[in-house]
Amino acid sequence: MGARSTGREAALQMLFAVEAGGSSAPRVVATFWRETPGDPEGRAYADEVVVGVAEDLAAVDEAIRKASTNWRLERMARVDRNVLRLGAWELMNRPEVPRAVILDEAVELAKRYGSEESGAFVNGVLDRIAENLGRVDRDR
C-alpha cells in the first residue's frame, strides 16, 4: 500500500475519532500518532486531510448534501459520512490527484470499514460531487 493509501486509511480513522469523541482535529492527530506508527509521508498526508476537512467542514458537508439528495448527512452511517468527507475534500483540494484514484480509494475504504452497501453508496455520491466540481479524468 502506498503512502497516500495508508494516509487515507489513517485519516479516516482520525476523522471518525474526531466526530465520535468530540475532540479537535489537532488533538486527535497528536493522540493518534502517539499510539500508531506510520511512515512520514503517509502521516503528513493524513494530517493534511484531517486538518483540511476540519477547517473546510461546512463546504465539504455542503458538497455532500448537494450530491446526496435522497440522504440527509446526519442520517448516513458514520463511516460512510467520514469516507465521503475524506473523498470530497480531496476532490475539492487536490486537483493533482486523479478523480479515479480518489473514488477508487474511497470505495475501498468504504468496503473495508462500512456496510455491504457502503462502497456503491460512496461511489455514487463522490461521482456526483466530482461532476458538480467539474472534475473529469483526462483519459475518459
Swiss-Prot record:
Cite the PANTHER family for this sequence. ANTITERMINATION NUSB DOMAIN-CONTAINING PROTEIN (PTHR11078:SF3), N UTILIZATION SUBSTANCE PROTEIN B-RELATED (PTHR11078)
Any one Gene Ontology molecular-function term assigned to this protein's record: RNA binding
Which Gene Ontology cellular-component terms appear in the entry?
cytosol
According to the lineage, what is the superkingdom?
Bacteria
Q: List the protein's name.
A: Transcription antitermination protein NusB
The upper taxonomy is: Bacteria, Pseudomonadati, Myxococcota, Polyangia, Polyangiales
Annotated GO biological processes are: DNA-templated transcription termination; transcription antitermination
Tell me the SUPFAM superfamilies matching this sequence: NusB-like
Q: Which cysteines are joined by disulfide bonds?
A: none
State the function annotated in the UniProt record. Involved in transcription antitermination. Required for transcription of ribosomal RNA (rRNA) genes. Binds specifically to the boxA antiterminator sequence of the ribosomal RNA (rrn) operons.
What Gene3D superfamilies would the database entry show? NusB-like (1.10.940.10)
Matching entries from InterPro entries are given as:
NusB-like_sf (IPR035926), NusB_fam (IPR011605), NusB_RsmB_TIM44 (IPR006027)
The UniProt similarity line reads: Belongs to the NusB family.
Q: Provide an example Pfam family for this protein.
A: NusB
Q: Is Metal-binding set as a keyword in this record?
A: no
Q: Which organism is it from?
A: Sorangium cellulosum (strain So ce56) (Polyangium cellulosum (strain So ce56))
Q: Which gene encodes it?
A: nusB
